[in-house]
Regions:
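ATP-binding N-terminal substructure of ATP-dependent carboxylate-amine bond-forming enzymes
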Residues: 1-93, 297-301, 305
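Short acidic/polar active-site loop segments enriched in Thr and Asp
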Residues: 62, 168, 240
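Peripheral (often C-terminal) accessory segments that flank ATP-dependent C-N-forming ligase machineries
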Residues: 291-333
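ATP-dependent carboxylate/phosphate-activation module, predominantly the ATP-grasp catalytic core
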Residues: 174-244, 248, 255, 266-294, ...
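Short, conserved charged micro-motifs
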Residues: 50-51, 154-156, 324-331
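Protein kinase-like catalytic core scaffold
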Residues: 132, 194, 261-264
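Active-site nucleotide/adenylate-binding loops and adjacent lid/helix of ATP-dependent enzymes
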Residues: 96-171, 176-178, 189-191, 221-233, ...
Length: 333
């Protein structure tokens, strides 16, 4: 489900397993890397659950999977549910890992630290401490997000964020500046969590208006040992309480003077290709594990317990935030 570049590795994995692979979304073929390599493609919007289910029944589809694309998460569950096919999450799990208010409440219930939030009552009572960060409750990427330094900017940003939110709900949080952005990814196998990845993420410059856009991630995070000691136990407890059995889960947050504060979740992998690095280092194919889950509901993948430390090595992922152009050269070792 979804034909973007982050799903190319998933399509290739299925094909290597000898599985006839179909991909669908409403993106034109020429702009869709997944459609160019799939055995077959449909031009059905990922939100058109009714038509996808209808066609899937007609074609006798054996499994459905996504795993890397944020907007596919809830439709993925709905499609699997209607078809009676395995799905690595249920309705409650996908809701709590896509709705930021529900996620923050779950964190509070499990003693996982979050970012301080302001309410409409705080606005009316003039109790907002600027600067603040405004965002839709469930939009993807940086859509509808804004940093606000005045009440005028805040009121304007709220209206923009509401337009990008599926239900008109928005979040108003304390703007964290100067702290290290920190990501964490887990993979569950038969109810047991494995810490796959920690990363320190670096955003672009304010001068180029790229301060909200990640340009580079370095793995493992320099705070990994500290995270495992201070936050990991409660995070694992939270996910087990949520009932996660198999599949990926990740969170974005900040390291804030020894406190790990999380703000954005996903019942999926982050939208990068780190799993290819993981495969190269450990000879463990997480994409094929996802295909197993799609077909059987389980996976026999074996993940090293200290995987997040990458055997003592380092890795980085660069995010090319550039306009359409021709790259003249690349340097490096």
């Amino acid at each position: 489900l979804g034909s973007a570049s982050v799903h190319v590795k998933l399509i290739k994995a299925a094909q290597e397993m000898g599985i006839y692979t179909i991909t669908t979304d409403n993106v034109p073929y020429e702009d869709s890397p997944g459609k160019k390599i799939a055995d077959e493609y449909w031009n059905l919007n990922i939100y058109d659950v009714k038509e996808i289910v209808k066609k899937a029944k007609k074609e006798h589809i054996d499994g459905v999977i996504c795993g890397w694309l944020d907007p596919c998460q809830r439709p993925y569950f709905q499609i699997c549910h209607e078809l009676g096919l395995p799905c690595y999450g249920d309705e409650k799990q996908f809701f709590k890992m896509t709705d930021k208010h529900a996620f923050k409440k779950m964190c509070e219930e499990n003693n996982v630290d979050i970012i301080d939030e302001f309410t409409e009552a705080d606005i009316k009572g003039n109790k907002v401490e600027f600067p603040v960060f405004v965002k839709p409750v469930d939009s993807r990427g940086s859509r509808g997000q804004a940093v606000c330094y005045t009440m005028k900017e805040l009121l304007s940003a709220i209206e923009v964020a509401k337009e990008e939110s599926s239900n008109g709900d928005v979040l108003i949080e304390k703007y964290i500046k100067g702290s290290q952005e920190f990501h964490v990814t887990y993979f569950f196998v038969d109810g047991e969590p494995y810490l796959l990845r920690t990363s320190d993420n670096y955003c672009g410059s304010e001068e180029m208006h790229m301060e909200k856009v990640v340009s580079c991630a370095v793995m493992p995070s320099r705070y990994t040992s500290q995270y495992i000691e201070k936050a990991h136990p409660n995070v694992v407890k939270m996910f087990k309480n949520l009932g996660i059995k198999n599949g990926p889960i990740f969170m974005q947050g900040f390291e804030d003077n020894g406190v790990f504060r999380f703000f954005d979740p996903g019942l999926r992998f982050p939208g990068v290709d780190y799993e290819l690095v993981f495969k190269k280092v450990f000879n463990v194919d997480l994409m094929k594990a996802m295909i197993q889950i799609a077909l059987t509901g389980k996976t026999d993948v074996v993940i090293p317990k200290d995987a997040a430390f990458i055997k003592g090595g380092r890795a980085s992922v660069l995010y090319l935030t550039i306009r359409a152009c021709t790259i003249s050269h690349l340097d490096g070792e």
